A protein has these predicted regions:
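Sec-dependent signal peptide recognition
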Residues: 2-8
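Intrinsic disorder/low-complexity segments
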Residues: 8-10, 99
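Processing junctions and N-termini across compartments
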Residues: 10, 63-66
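C-terminal motif of bacterial Sec signal peptides marking the signal peptidase cleavage site
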Residues: 13-15
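Flexible coil segments in periplasmic/lumen-exposed cytochrome c-class electron-transfer proteins
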Residues: 17-56, 66-67, 112-145
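Gly/Gly-Pro-rich "capping" loops immediately C-terminal to redox-active cysteine motifs
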Residues: 51-62, 74-104, 110, 117
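Short cysteine clusters
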Residues: 69-72
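A general structural signal marking secondary-structure boundaries and capping sites
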Residues: 76, 107, 133-137
């Protein structure tokens, strides 16, 4: 039996050991949804062309479900693994343009970039949906005692 392929595979495996990103580095890295990076020359977030449009909010809600946003942000965007998107506490800014940028380019610490999968119009409709959500009546706060 020829053991050369096995020896070669083990050698390559040993040579690659230790080159994996640390858990911290993987956590801080930007992640591209579906492995597809946003295209070069991506649009700058400006004014939301769908702001306040109810039908666009409905389409954005559909995108929220189809793209599995609720898998991290919970049903109705109330928060789960990812933060709540309806309590007014925006980590990277809560303006339409800032939310667009977060969805399009992603953010370190777990928010994938969807600019490679979704066209800008779909992202704006998702922003419209998120901005249409009412904040919960009982926003939990942290006690500093």
């Amino acid at each position: 039996m020829d053991l050369r392929p096995l020896v070669l595979a083990l050698g390559v495996s040993a040579a690659c050991r230790g080159r994996e990103a640390t858990p911290q580095a993987r956590y801080e890295a930007r992640v591209f949804a579906g492995g597809v990076a946003p295209p070069a020359g991506a649009p700058q977030a400006g004014k939301n062309p769908f702001r306040g449009d109810r039908q666009s909010a409905v389409e954005g809600e559909r995108t929220f479900g189809v793209m599995n946003c609720d898998g991290c942000h919970g049903g109705g965007a109330v928060g789960w693994v990812g933060p709540s998107l309806r309590d007014g506490r925006w980590r990277y800014g809560g303006s339409d343009g800032e939310i667009f940028q977060s969805i399009y380019y992603g953010q370190p610490h777990g928010m994938p970039a969807y600019g490679g999968l979704l066209p800008p119009g779909a992202i704006w409709k998702l922003v419209t949906y998120l901005q249409s959500l009412e904040p919960p009546a009982d926003v939990p706060t942290q006690s500093w005692k």
